[in-house]
């Protein structure tokens, strides 16, 4: 009797581990589409543009249950993962990290101080950027949209689409855009 129960327990542990997101040495969740850069935002924006992608910064912290939710329940969905990989140049910032970040305005600070400068209070927070950002503004000022917190697959996917479609330029709020898309997706 013990053998079938033990085998079942091992299979369940393997199945649960399949859905666990990778964790880096810094304690943050990692995704294959994240870029390891020098965190110079002007250079990152130029590289994103060269690849025909949009720059996206994701601020996270060690032990964040909402970051875990995004990395285990939302980002692994094939449609979302492919969309991010195809359309975004993603740079991860550690809310309490010490790696230097150079902002669009030229100021260089450790991640933890840059996050304070940007007044980002929650994780995950995702900042989205246009193809051009003035050199006299911070990332917080240059972002076309900010997504604070964890959201479900439909909201997240629709936000990514709204950014790529430049919905922020159309005058249609994200909420209205999302409501229309969500109605279609729910059919």
Residue positions per predicted region:
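Sec-dependent signal peptide recognition
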Residues: 2-9
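N-terminal "domain-start" segment that seeds a small globular fold
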Residues: 21-44
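Thiol-based oxidoreductase modules, predominantly thioredoxin-like and allied folds used
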Residues: 35-37, 77-109
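Detector for the c-type heme attachment site
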Residues: 68-72
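A short beta-strand-turn-helix
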Residues: 36-55, 84
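Non-catalytic, surface beta->alpha helical segment in thiol-disulfide oxidoreductase systems
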Residues: 116-171
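Short active-site neighborhood of thiol/selenol oxidoreductases, capturing the structured segment around
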Residues: 51-65, 90
């Amino acid at each position: 009797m013990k053998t079938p129960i033990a085998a079942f327990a091992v299979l369940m542990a393997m199945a649960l581990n399949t859905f666990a997101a990778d964790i880096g040495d810094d304690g943050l969740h990692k995704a294959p589409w994240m870029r390891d850069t020098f965190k110079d935002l002007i250079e990152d924006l130029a590289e994103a543009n060269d690849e025909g992608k949009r720059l996206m910064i994701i601020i996270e912290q060690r032990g964040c249950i909402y970051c875990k939710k995004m990395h285990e329940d939302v980002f692994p969905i094939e449609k979302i993962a492919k969309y991010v990989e195809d359309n975004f140049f993603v740079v991860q910032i550690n809310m309490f990290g010490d790696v230097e970040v150079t902002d669009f305005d030229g100021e260089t600070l450790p991640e933890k101080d840059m996050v304070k400068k940007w007044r980002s209070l929650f994780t995950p927070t995702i900042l989205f950027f246009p193809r051009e950002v003035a050199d006299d503004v911070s990332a917080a000022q240059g972002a076309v949209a900010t997504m604070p917190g964890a959201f479900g697959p439909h909201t997240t996917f629709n936000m990514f689409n709204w950014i790529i479609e430049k919905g922020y330029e159309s005058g249609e709020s994200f909420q209205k855009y999302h409501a229309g898309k969500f109605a279609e997706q729910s059919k």
